[in-house]
């Protein structure tokens, strides 16, 4: 679910590395939820979830700056998609997490993983050739 696939590569090393990191962070939460059922992972999950929020915001800002710098025509629609995930992550707060109901966390992380992979394959791939033609690899 959270593994990197070569099919996700947009052929821009810095962006690919950031995408890999997003999958890695989400995977850490998933792994925590599925290990050691007798141990309360709430604080760790919250800490990693915060890191996921922060890194997602960092990645989106970086990607959007590149789009603006190189004059990518679909920047505005791309930003709207980014905003959707940011709002979803911000909406998911401490009160929404019940470690006794792991399914709520799994649901969020599955959504994030599916959203990221879908976004990369459908939306980010649109800028792959554009960036490469502008010398960005």
Residues covered by each model-derived region:
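Small-residue-biased structural context
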Residues: 1-137
């Amino acid at each position: 679910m959270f593994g990197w696939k070569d099919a996700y590569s947009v052929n821009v090393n810095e962006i690919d590395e950031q995408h890999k990191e997003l999958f890695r962070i989400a995977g850490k939460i998933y792994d925590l939820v599925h290990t050691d059922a007798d141990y309360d992972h709430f604080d760790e999950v919250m800490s990693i979830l915060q890191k996921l929020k922060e890194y997602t915001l960092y990645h989106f800002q970086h990607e959007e700056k590149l789009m603006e710098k190189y004059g990518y025509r679909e920047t505005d629609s791309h930003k709207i998609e980014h905003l959707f995930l940011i709002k979803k992550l911000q909406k998911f707060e401490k009160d929404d997490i019940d470690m006794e109901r792991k399914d709520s966390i799994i649901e969020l992380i599955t959504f994030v993983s599916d959203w990221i992979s879908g976004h990369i394959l459908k939306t980010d791939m649109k800028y792959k050739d554009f960036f490469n033609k502008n010398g960005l690899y």
